[in-house]
Swiss-Prot record:
It holds the Pfam family Ribosomal_S19. Belongs to the universal ribosomal protein uS19 family. This is Small ribosomal subunit protein uS19. The gene is rpsS. GO terms for molecular function: rRNA binding; structural constituent of ribosome. Signal peptide: none annotated. GO terms for biological process: ribosomal small subunit assembly; translation. It comes from Neisseria gonorrhoeae (strain ATCC 700825 / FA 1090). It comes from the Bacteria. PROSITE patterns: RIBOSOMAL_S19. One of its GO terms (cellular component) is small ribosomal subunit. SUPFAM superfamilies: Ribosomal protein S19.
Length: 92
């Protein structure tokens, strides 16, 4: 289910503080965060946020069409290595 409109988007406070600090200092380094559940706001456009995927921080450059989505949608947690080939097909 979608979040209620009267509640507004959810963003962790520590992430908002980091974004405000970067905007004030014009720093170009990625903002490192573990908050995959935070919603992308229009304030984030043009920033690079390194989102944790369980193993590493994946840098995500925020563009205008990402607004309203969650940060975790752009940092994949699973790597697909393909299905195993059938053993019968290998023998022939």
């Amino acid at each position: 289910m979608a979040r209620s409109l009267k509640k507004g988007p959810y963003v962790d406070l520590h992430l908002l503080k980091k974004v405000d600090a970067v905007r004030a200092s014009n720093d170009k380094r990625p903002i490192k965060t573990w908050s995959r559940r935070s919603t992308i706001l229009p304030d984030f456009i043009g920033l690079t946020i390194a989102v944790h995927n369980g193993r590493t921080h994946v840098p995500v450059f925020i563009s205008d069409n990402m607004v309203g989505h969650k940060l975790g949608e752009f940092s994949l947690t699973r790597t697909f290595k393909g299905h195993l080939a059938d053993k019968k097909a290998k023998k022939k």
